[in-house]
Regions:
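Conserved long alpha-helical elements within nucleotide-processing catalytic cores of c-di-GMP signaling
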Residues: 9-13, 19-43, 50-77, 85-94, ...
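GGDEF/GGEEF active-site signature
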Residues: 44, 70-133
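Hydrophobic pocket-lining residues within nucleotide cofactor-binding pockets
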Residues: 49, 99, 130, 189-192
């Protein structure tokens, strides 16, 4: 009976695909934080997977699901101990309480690099940090606004190179090369001048 209750509680608070906390958990977390009036440092990262709908259309739903799971895995490994939520299909929020600014920004930088290398189109991020959390909603809006700016930059720059370049596929190719799946040959060039 206890296991059943625990399973139901988990299913009610977690996203079934990513294993992250869900939107309902975020609402409860936010309300508890606002009620508690905690005077702690707070870093927030808002993330949105780039071109997830296009990925689903071009390669099928399973490709999009794999991308969501990979992004979630990177977030969890990058922000162990933080509260990580999947708010909707391609939107994520990370809330890191009581972390130093330098540590928070270092984690964001490493996570961004990993997300760019492990997902087909990367994830647009916006992050904010406050030493003494005064207004969670304001800090959250700020992170979301910065994410939207980065999303627009992605779409502006994605017309040619980003459309055809994927770090995920490059990493697979390099791995296949290391495993001997390809034979590399040097083609000499001749310049009569």
């Amino acid at each position: 009976k206890r296991r059943l209750y625990e399973r139901l509680e988990y299913e009610a608070t977690h996203d079934s695909l990513s294993g992250l906390l869900n939107r309902e958990s975020f609402v409860r977390f936010r309300n508890d934080l606002m009620r508690g009036g905690r005077n702690v440092s707070c870093g927030i990262v808002a993330g949105d997977i780039n071109d997830l709908k296009q990925l689903n259309r071009d390669y099928g739903q399973s490709s999009g699901d794999t991308t969501i799971k990979e992004a979630a895995s990177v977030m969890v490994s990058s922000f162990a101990g933080a509260s990580i939520f999947r708010l909707s299909g391609d939107e994520f929020i990370i809330v890191s309480l009581e972390s130093a600014y330098e540590e928070f920004m270092e984690r964001v930088g490493k996570m961004e690099w990993l997300l760019d290398s492990r997902t087909p189109n990367g994830v647009s991020l916006g992050c904010t940090w406050e030493e003494h959390l005064a207004d969670f909603d304001r800090l959250m809006r700020h992170a979301e606004e910065l994410m939207l700016v980065n999303k627009q930059i992605y779409y502006k720059d994605s017309s040619q190179e980003r459309k055809h370049y994927s770090p995920e596929y490059l990493n697979r190719l390099l791995q296949d090369m290391e495993e001997g799946c390809y034979r590399l040959c040097l083609q000499p060039k001749y310049n009569p001048l």
